[in-house]
Amino acid sequence: MENCSAASTFLTDSLELELGTEWCKPPYFSCAVDNRGGGKHFSGESYLCSGALKRLILNLDPLPTNFEEDTLEIFGIQWVTETALVNSSRELFHLFRQQLYNLETLLQSSCDFGKVSTLHCKADNIRQQCVLFLHYVKVFIFRYLKVQNAESHVPVHPYEALEAQLPSVLIDELHGLLLYIGHLSELPSVNIGAFVNQNQIKLFPPSWHLLHLHLDIHWLVLEILYMLGEKLKQVVYGHQFMNLASDNLTNISLFEEHCETLLCDLISLSLNRYDKVRSSESLMSDQCPCLCIKELWVLLIHLLDHRSKWFVSESFWNWLNKLLKTLLEKSSDRRRSSMPVIQSRDPLGFSWWIITHVASFYKFDRHGVPDEMRKVESNWNFVEELLKKSISVQGVILEEQLRMYLHCCLTLCDFWEPNIAIVTILWEYYSKNLNSSFSISWLPFKGLANTMKSPLSMLEMVKTCCCDKQDQELYKSSSSYTIFLCILAKVVKKAMKSNGPHPWKQVKGRIYSKFHQKRMEELTEVGLQNFFSLFLLLAAVAEVEDVASHVLDLLNFLKPAFVTSQRALIWKGHMAFLLMYAQKNLDIGVLAEKFSCAFREKAKEFLVSKNEEMVQRQTIWTLLSIYIDGVQEVFETSYCLYPSHEKLLNDGFSMLLRACRESELRTVLSFLQAVLARIRSMHQQLCQELQRDNVDLFVQSSLSAKERHLAAVASALWRHFFSFLKSQRMSQVVPFSQLADAAADFTLLAMDMPSTAPSDFQPQPVISIIQLFGWDDIICPQVVARYLSHVLQNSTLCEALSHSGYVSFQALTVRSWIRCVLQMYIKNLSGPDDLLIDKNLEEAVEKEYMKQLVKLTRLLFNLSEVKSIFSKAQVEYLSISEDPKKALVRFFEAVGVTYGNVQTLSDKSAMVTKSLEYLGEVLKYIKPYLGKKVFSAGLQLTYGMMGILVKSWAQIFATSKAQKLLFRIIDCLLLPHAVLQQEKELPAPMLSAIQKSLPLYLQGMCIVCCQSQNPNAYLNQLLGNVIEQYIGRFLPASPYVSDLGQHPVLLALRNTATIPPISSLKKCIVQVIRKSYLEYKGSSPPPRLASILAFILQLFKETNTDIYEVELLLPGILKCLVLVSEPQVKRLATENLQYMVKACQVGSEEEPSSQLTSVFRQFIQDYGMRYYYQVYSILETVATLDQQVVIHLISTLTQSLKDSEQKWGLGRNIAQREAYSKLLSHLGQMGQDEMQRLENDNT
C-alpha cells in the first residue's frame, strides 16, 4: 500500500510539473529579488520555488522549455546543441574556468558607488553564462546522452566512441572544477547588503556574485552527478583522478566526497555565526548569513534523504552527525587533508545550536513552502548522546550553558516525535541536583522566588511550562530546571496523545523511584520548591489524583523541624494542588479535610497569641493568608461546589475574625466578599438552568443537588462571618467600607437564598439585615451611606421591598439618607463629641464619604416615592443630586410644597405621618454637634438645615401631630440652657450659625402660629422668647443704624415678601421690645438703650408702621427723652419720635390719630408737672411735624399747668408759663388764643 501511495504521489507530481512548464527557466541562487510568489520564503528564481528540486527527484526534464534550438550560445560561441558537450567538453569546461577567473579578477577593482553599476553588470553576466552552461550539462545528460552497451562488439561511429567516454570525462572535469573553486569557507567575506540606484534596482559587488556562483556550482555539480547516476544506472569511473584512498574516482565517490565537503563548508560558515552570538540570544539569531545558504541546506536535506530512501546511502542526519561527532572529538587528524579544519570554542553548544536550526529547515517542502503537517525525520539518537555529554558529571556544568542546551532540546521536542529517553536522561541529572537554585550570577533571579510567591503563581508557572509555544526569552526568564519541566510536559503530553498511558507510567516510575524517606529528608527549601514544581507539573499533564496522593505521602517523610520552618511553602504547595483539583472540577474532599483542620489549629493559635508577640503573629498570619487567598481562588475557579467546599469554611474563621487587626481584617473581608459574589453568581446560573424548558429529571436532580451544596456553603458563611459583622456594627475595628460591602453582600445573598439566613432573621431576612445596617440610627453614617448605595443599586431588591408592604422601605431609606447628610461631619457615633475638625468645610468631609453620599443621593432620587414628591411639588431636582446638602434642602422644600397642595384632611393627615417618618429622631442626629466640642461646619449645617425644615414644613408643624417636634427643635437649638443664661457668652461658631439661620426659624414659627389648628399659647410664648433672646444677642456694639442691617430678626421681616403673617411677627417683635427692652427698673434706664433705639428705628425704616406699634413703643420713647440725658439716646429717641409721628400722619386725614393723641395725653399727665420743660421741648418737636396733634393737647397741657401751680401753692410759675408760651407760639392761631386766655386768667 505504501508503494502504491508513493507511486500515486509520483505520478501526480510529474503531471503537475509537465503541465506547468511554460514558465521554466534556469534557476539560480538569489536573495537580491523580493519574493514574487506572495508569502514565499525563497526567491522565485530559486531551485526550490522554481520546481528544479522536484524535477530532479522525479527524474523529469530539468528545463523542458530551454535548449530546444539546433544551436545555442555559450560563453559567446555558437555550439550545436545535441553534440557540443560530446565534441567539446574539455573546451567548454576550460571556458567555464576562464569565466570564473574573470569574475575573481573583478574582486580586485575598487567597488565605489560610481563603478558599482558597471561591476554589477559584468559580474552578473559572467555568473549567468556559467550557470547556463551547467544547466546545459544537465539537459544534455537527460535528453541526448545514450547508454552504451559495453559488451557489444559491433564497430561504433567515432562520435559514439566519444559519447561513451563523456561520463568519465564529466567526472574528471567536475572534480577538477571543484578543486579549482575550493571551499566556501575560504571565500573572502561578503557584505550581503546591496547598493540601490535611482531606479530602486539593487546593485551587488563582485564578491556577492562570486559567492552565489560558488553556491550554484556546488549544488549543480551535485545535481549533475545525481542525474548521471540515474541515467546510466551504473558506476562511472574517472580517468584522470583517484580519490584519497587511492581508489579510482567514481560518480558515487565524487558525490559523497562533495557532499561531505559542502556540509563541512556550511558547518564552518555556521560556526562563524555562532561564535558571534551570545548564548542568551542563540535561538533568536539566524544561523544563515544569506537566504541562499539556507536554501542550500534545504536542498541537501531533500536530496540526501531522498537518496537514502531509494538507494543504499546515508540520510542527511547521518551525514551531519558524522561531521559533528568529529568536531566533538577534537581529532582533526582523522579528517582528510582536503577537509577544512573546523574548531569551536564551544563544540557542545554549537552542536545543539546547529541541529536545532537545521531541524527547523525540515518544515520546508520541495517547493520551499513551510508545511507544518509534513512528517519530519528526527535525530534523537545523536541528540541523546549529545545530551549525555552535556550533563556529564566529569566536568563543571555551567547554568548558562545548560539553559541554552535545554532550550534547544525543548525546541527539538516541538519538531520531532516524543522521546521518553530524553526525559530519563535529564531526570537522572536533576534528581541529583534538586537542591540547586539553577541561577546565573549576572542575570536577575526570576525563577523560584517569583514562582513560589503564591499557590496561584505556582500553577501559573506550571501552566506556562505546559504551553505549546514557549517564550523566546526563556533563557533569561527561566532556569534550566524550569526548561526541563517544559520538556517533561511536552514529551509526556505528546507521548500520551499518540501512545496512551504507557509513556506516563514509564515517566512516573522513573520519577517516583527517586523519592524516598532519605531523599525527602535531604531536601532544602530550594529543593522543596523544585519538588513541588515537578509534581504540580506531573499532576497537570497526567493523573492529578494519583500525583497529589503520592505527594502527601512523601511530605510525611519530612522531619518535624523542617516542616515547621518550611510550613508556609508546604501550605502553598498543598493549596496549589487544591486549586488544580478545582480547575479540573474534581472533588476536593480528601485535600480539604486535612488542610482545613490545619487552618483551624493555626487560627486558634492566632487568637490566643499576644499582640506583643509580633514575630509569632506574623508567622502564623503568613500561613493563614496563604489559606485564605487559596480558598478564594478555589471558590472562584470551581465550576460547581461540592459538600467538601463547606469543609474549607470551618469555625477557624470565627476565631480568626476575633483576633484580626484592621489590616488583617481587610484581607479576610475581601475574601468573604469574593466568596459571596461567587456563590450568588453560581446560584443565578443554577436558577437559569432550572427555568429552562424541557429539563429532564436527571438534570433537574443534579441541579437540585448543586443547589443544596450551595446552600450548605452559604449557611457556613452566615454561621462563621455574619455574626461577627453584626457584633462590629458600632465599632471602629472593621473598616467602614468593607463592613458596608460585606453587609450588602449578605443582604443580596438573603434575597437570593433566604432559607440559608439564620432563624432569628426569618421570615424576612432581607428586612432584618437592612434594619441592622441601613436604618439603625446608631450605625455610623459612613457605613449606612455605602450600604444603602449597594442596596438601592439592585433594582430587583428595591422593587421587591417597595411592594412588600411589610415596612415603609422607601420612607425609612429616606430617613437614613437625611441622617447621613446631617451627620456628614461626624466621624463615628461611639462618642458624642467625635467630630471632624477642619477649617475648610469642603475638606472637612472625607472625599470618599462625600462621593458615597453623592451616589446615595442620586440613587435615592430614583425612588418612586421621592420622585412623586418632587413631581407634585413641581420642583426640579436632577441638577442638584450631585450636592447632597442642596438636595436635602430641595427635598424639604418639596415636601412642604406637596403638603400645601394636598386638599383632603385624610391625605393631609397621612402626609404629616409620612413626613415625620422621614425625619425620625432628627434631634438625635444633630446632637453630636451640640456637645462640648464646637465645630463650625457641623453647627452651620445643623442650624441651616433645621431652619429650612422649620420654614418649609411650617404648615406641617402647624398640625397637632408635628408641633411637639417643633417645640423640641426650638428648645434644643434656639433656647438651650446656655442661651437662657444671659450672663454667659455663647460660642462664636454657634452664634454665627444661629445668626445665619434665625430668619428661617422666625418665619416658620410665625406661620405655625398663624395657621395652627389649635391656638397654642405656648407656641406664641416660644416665639417671644426666641425674639427676646436674640434681639439683644445680635445688637451691635455701637448704636448705629447702619450696623443693624444684617440683624437676623430684621432679616426675618425683610425676607418675608411671600409670607402673609409678617404683621404678626412684627407685632410679636414690638411686644417683646416693649416688655423686655424699654422697661425701666425704677429710675434706671434699661441697658443698651441706644442700641435698642437704633434697632427700633431700623425696624420702622424697613417696615410699615402700624398705630398699634406706636401705641406700644411711643410711651417708652417719650420716657427716654424725658429721663435720659445721654446724647445718643436723645438723638435716637427723637428720630424714633419723628418716624412715629410721620407714620401716624399716613392714613389719618386732617384729624390726628386718637391713639397717638391718647399716648401724648397720658405722657403729659405722667410727666407734665415734674418734667414740664422736657415735655414742652418734646412737644415742640412734634409740633414741627404735626401741629394738629399738639393743638389737640392744648387743653390737657393747660390743665396740667394749673394743676402743677395749684399743687405747689406758690401762685403762678413764671418759668413754666414761659416755657408753655414758647410751645404755644408754634401752634398758630390756636396757640395765640390759648396764650391770651392764660394772660386773662386771674385764677
Swiss-Prot record:
Pfam families xrefs: MMS22L_C (PF14911), MMS22L_N (PF14910)
Subcellular location: Nucleus; Chromosome
Keyword Cytoplasm in annotation: no
Domain of life: Eukaryota
GO cellular component, one term: site of double-strand break
GO molecular function: single-stranded DNA binding
PTM section of the record: Degraded by the ubiquitin-proteasome system upon replication stress.
InterPro entries the UniProt entry points to: MMS22-like, MMS22L_C, MMS22L_N
GO BP field: chromatin organization; double-strand break repair via homologous recombination; protein localization to chromatin; replication fork processing
Main location: nucleus
Keyword terms, alphabetized: Chromatin regulator, Chromosome, DNA damage, DNA repair, DNA-binding, Nucleus
Subunit structure: Component of the MMS22L-TONSL complex, a complex at least composed of MMS22L and TONSL/NFKBIL2. Interacts with RAD51; interaction is direct.
PANTHER family in the record: PROTEIN MMS22-LIKE
Protein family membership: Belongs to the MMS22 family. MMS22L subfamily.
Described function: Component of the MMS22L-TONSL complex, a complex that promotes homologous recombination-mediated repair of double-strand breaks (DSBs) at stalled or collapsed replication forks. The MMS22L-TONSL complex is required to maintain genome integrity during DNA replication. It mediates the assembly of RAD51 filaments on single-stranded DNA (ssDNA): the MMS22L-TONSL complex is recruited to DSBs following histone replacement by histone chaperones and eviction of the replication protein A complex (RPA/RP-A) from DSBs.
Protein name: Protein MMS22-like
Gene source species: Homo sapiens (Human)
Gene: MMS22L
